[in-house]
A protein has these predicted regions:
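A compositional signature for long Ser/Thr(±Pro)-rich, low-complexity
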Residues: 1-344
Length: 344
């Protein structure tokens, strides 16, 4: 766990609207465990911030879950793209109280899974999308990547969607929770640089245009998979939900001097990474979902509680968030309430 900021404390985001007040109600770990075991697990796909969200789930659900892989034999760490899972702990007192579906295997069926995917697609797929945008013109590079590209971790949606839709006992996922935008930069995708302005940094509009097309292709693909017939036991494809969590930029300057929450979201005053573009990218993903018109794909604008919390960052930087600050914990609570609403 990353060291906490010395003035950081847990803060709860409580909605003011009477209609949304219930989303501020606390959710016990027992309620979360019951939902994950009986109604279906959560599959988290994204970058290092999503990985932190996964880690926070292990804390929220302790001692009722066992996390894998075991990093101890590997010196305490491993490849960043290793699959990570939370399984129901056989010694949990809740085991005898739960009623999981037929076919659920306590040793094989994850409650929560994380896969590191920075750019939604694997490189060859993203290259194909980019070339199709330009009608395979010779004026654009053959690849967005290349030897000068910064490191990113990627996986084809064919792979992670096949995991998401797999039947029991291998899987029983109800929710696919996806968030992306932070690695969509000219560092990760140097082939997207404007040839007339190759020095342009992460805010190059060509990256944004590629992102807009990529999320359009992605939402269409995901919607198609959800319409496919289900195989085997478990949550049916028609019952699954794909939730796009608004991506979260960091805070400018020295966030570690902040002593508490802000009263309003600060506008960016300079070009830090691609942070000033994140809002537009979130809106692009939201628009792609709306255009698809599939009620199983939904956009969750959960970024504001974190945008108001520059004090909640870990000491390492002003992007990653301290476990226990209330941000990730609030996301889990909101998603639980959201899924309960859909069941009502």
């Amino acid at each position: 766990m990353t060291p906490a900021h010395p003035t950081e404390t847990t803060q709860d985001w409580i909605p003011k609207s009477p209609v949304c007040m219930m989303y501020g109600e606390q959710v016990s770990r027992e309620q979360l465990i019951r939902a994950l075991a009986e109604q279906g697990g959560w599959f988290l796909v994204g970058n290092s911030v999503t990985e932190q969200h996964f880690f926070s789930m292990s804390c929220l659900l302790y001692p009722h879950v066992i996390a894998t892989p075991d990093y101890a034999p590997h010196g305490g760490s491993g490849p960043r793209d290793w699959p990570q899972n939370l399984y129901l702990n056989p010694s949990s007192p809740l085991v005898d109280q739960l009623k999981p579906p037929a076919g659920f295997d306590i040793k094989r069926t994850p409650l929560v899974t994380f896969r590191r995917v920075d750019l939604l697609f694997e490189p060859s797929e993203l290259d194909a999308i980019h070339l199709s945008m330009h009608n395979s013109s010779d004026s654009v590079p053959s690849t967005l990547f290349g030897p000068e590209a910064s490191e990113s971790y990627n996986l084809s949606p064919d792979k992670y969607l096949s995991i998401f839709t797999a039947p029991l006992p291998e899987a029983n996922y109800k929710v696919l929770l996806v968030s992306t935008a932070g690695h969509w930069t000219t560092a990760s995708l140097p082939g997207a640089r404007d040839p007339s302005d190759v020095q342009k940094e992460a805010t190059n509009p060509a990256v944004y245009k590629t992102f807009v097309e990529a999320v359009r292709v992605w939402t269409k693909k995901v919607s198609g998979v959800l319409k496919e017939p289900s195989v085997g036991q478990g949550v049916k494809n028609s019952e699954k939900q794909v939730l796009i969590r608004a991506y979260l930029p960091g805070h400018e300057f020295d966030c570690h001097k902040e002593t508490g929450p802000l009263t309003r979201v600060r506008e960016f005053t300079r070009e830090w990474y691609n942070w000033s573009w994140i809002g537009r990218m979130n809106e692009a993903f939201k628009a792609a979902i709306q255009a698809q018109g599939n009620p199983q794909l939904r956009f969750l604008g959960l970024d504001k509680p974190a945008l108001l919390r520059p004090d909640a960052h870990s000491l390492s930087d002003c992007l990653h968030i301290q476990i226990g600050a209330g941000i990730f914990e609030g996301w889990a609570r909101y998603i639980w309430h959201f899924m309960e609403d859909l069941r009502a």
